[in-house]
Amino acid sequence: MISKARKQEIILKFGKNPKNTGNTSVQIALLTEDIERLKLHFLKNKKDKHSMRGFIAKVNKRKKLLNYLRINSFDTYKETIEALNIRK
């Protein structure tokens, strides 16, 4: 789970103000933070299949949001993937 301080930091960076939590870029950044944390968890706990299901759901949700952002605002999409370093 992401700490409140880290979550607020991400919201300010990608949402431009503290109340803008529904912004697609903010949602993608928060999901990316969760995904990175879960990757480390799976290195230690290879047989944790229950958490793997949630991990896959988060990856798919991020993928859908990235596709939405790419279609509706390509410039924001490019900025987001460069800032998060998730695609080449």
Curated annotation (Swiss-Prot):
The protein's superkingdom reads Bacteria
Entries under Pfam families matching the protein:
Ribosomal_S15 (PF00312)
Q: Which gene encodes it?
A: rpsO
Species per Swiss-Prot/TrEMBL record: Mesomycoplasma hyopneumoniae (strain J / ATCC 25934 / NCTC 10110)
Q: What is the lineage of its organism?
A: Bacteria, Bacillati, Mycoplasmatota, Mycoplasmoidales, Metamycoplasmataceae
Give the protein family: Belongs to the universal ribosomal protein uS15 family.
An example Gene Ontology molecular-function term:
structural constituent of ribosome
Name of this chain's protein: Small ribosomal subunit protein uS15
Q: Name a biological process GO annotation.
A: translation
Q: Which InterPro entries match?
A: Ribosomal_uS15 (IPR000589), Ribosomal_uS15_bac-type (IPR005290), uS15_NS1_RNA-bd_sf (IPR009068)
Q: What does this protein do?
A: One of the primary rRNA binding proteins, it binds directly to 16S rRNA where it helps nucleate assembly of the platform of the 30S subunit by binding and bridging several RNA helices of the 16S rRNA.
Question: Which keywords label this protein?
Answer: Ribonucleoprotein, Ribosomal protein, RNA-binding, rRNA-binding
Subunit notes for this chain?
Part of the 30S ribosomal subunit. Forms a bridge to the 50S subunit in the 70S ribosome, contacting the 23S rRNA.
GO terms for CC?
Answer: cytoplasm; ribonucleoprotein complex; ribosome
Matches recorded under HAMAP family:
Ribosomal_uS15_B
